């Protein structure tokens, strides 16, 4: 846990196996609203991961500062095909700031989708 009010958690789960576990864990979270700052790299099966994401969350799609990162707009477009709406942000810092501004004390913010996303978050947002 990175912050307590609102709760902010990050995780490096970045593939289907990781998200099978993470989606179960996120399903147990008690909060008013869940916010997910999410990005992935281009060599992962994003469609299968998107199927596992909690549909009730607010999404902030972003990309890490690495050549392997999928564009935030590509993720946003793919997510729409899976019934997930959200806004796109060019950096993890901008996505996290938007989520944090939108969150209330009883909300939950999750940052993840790739080790690079978490790395950018820890480097630039903490």
Residue locations for each model-derived region?
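A general structural signal for well-ordered alpha-helical segments in protein cores
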Residues: 19, 72-75, 118
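Surface-exposed, flexible loop/turn segments at secondary-structure boundaries
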Residues: 42-44, 67, 94, 117
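Active-site-adjacent alpha-helix immediately C-terminal to a catalytic or transition-state-stabilizing loop
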Residues: 119-126
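Residue-level signal for alpha-helix termini/capping positions
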Residues: 27, 100-104, 126
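C-terminal helical cap/extension that packs against the catalytic core
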Residues: 7-8, 50-108
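Nucleotide phosphate-binding/pyrophosphate-handling subdomain across enzymes
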Residues: 1-58
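Active-site-proximal loop/hinge segments that shape catalytic or ion-binding/gating pockets
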Residues: 114
């Amino acid at each position: 846990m990175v912050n307590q009010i609102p709760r902010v958690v990050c995780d490096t789960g970045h593939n289907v196996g990781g998200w099978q576990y993470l989606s179960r864990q996120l399903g147990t979270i008690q909060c008013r609203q869940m916010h997910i700052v999410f990005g992935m790299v281009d060599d992962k099966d994003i469609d299968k991961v998107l199927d596992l994401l909690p549909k009730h969350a607010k999404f902030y799609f972003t990309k890490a500062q690495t050549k392997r990162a999928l564009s935030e707009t590509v993720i946003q477009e793919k997510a729409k095909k899976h019934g997930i709406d959200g806004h796109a942000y060019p950096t993890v810092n901008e996505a996290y700031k938007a989520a944090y501004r939108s969150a209330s004390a009883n909300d939950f913010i999750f940052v993840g989708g790739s080790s690079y996303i978490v790395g950018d978050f820890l480097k630039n947002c903490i």
